């Protein structure tokens, strides 16, 4: 079990990785993300709930094809089974943390770039067929 008591805003601001798993427990997982200007998280659907808190930057949330703006201090709840994407429409990285319940990624997951994350997801799906 991971116990976490840190300044999450500072950790998010310092994060340079597209995806960085910070803590994983049996029923939840904490992940930091940094999305470059003009990029997105990627259209996806999870079998778990996801809560995203945006620390800095600006963009657009797309939940089941409905678009809405996001900015610093936005919180978005994505229920399991909801198709979603988050797009950075600003000029600076979109910085956020995400809580999955239960965990979505393997403990220790770290992707320097979105391309690394996409490649890892493809490998994961091939291995788990």
Which sequence ranges carry the predicted segments?
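A short, N-terminal "cap"/entry segment at the start of jelly-roll beta-barrel domains
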Residues: 1-27, 111-129
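Conserved short histidine dyad/triad with adjacent acidic residue
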Residues: 16, 31-45
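A generic "binding-loop/recognition-motif" signal
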Residues: 26-28, 37, 47, 66, ...
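Short, charged/polar surface micro-motifs in flexible loops or helix N-caps
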Residues: 26-28, 37-39, 58-60, 102-106
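Short, conserved beta-strand element in jelly-roll/cupin
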Residues: 34-36, 46-61, 99
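Histidine-centered metal-chelating micro-motifs
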Residues: 40-41, 60, 76, 80-86
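Short acidic-glycine-tyrosine-enriched beta hairpin
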Residues: 66-80
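Ligand-binding loop in jelly-roll beta-barrel domains
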Residues: 80-106
């Amino acid at each position: 079990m991971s116990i976490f008591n840190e300044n999450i805003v500072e950790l998010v601001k310092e994060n340079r990785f597209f995806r960085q798993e910070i803590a994983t427990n049996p029923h939840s997982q904490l992940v930091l993300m940094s999305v470059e200007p003009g990029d997105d998280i990627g259209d996806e659907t999870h079998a778990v709930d996801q809560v995203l808190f945006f620390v800095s930057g600006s963009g657009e949330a797309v939940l089941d094809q409905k678009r809405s703006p996001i900015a610093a201090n936005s919180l978005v709840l994505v229920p399991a089974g909801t198709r979603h994407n988050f797009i950075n429409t600003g000029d600076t990285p979109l910085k956020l943390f995400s809580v999955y319940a239960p965990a979505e990624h393997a403990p220790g997951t770290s992707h320097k770039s979105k391309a690394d994350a996409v490649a890892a997801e493809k490998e994961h799906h091939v291995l788990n067929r």
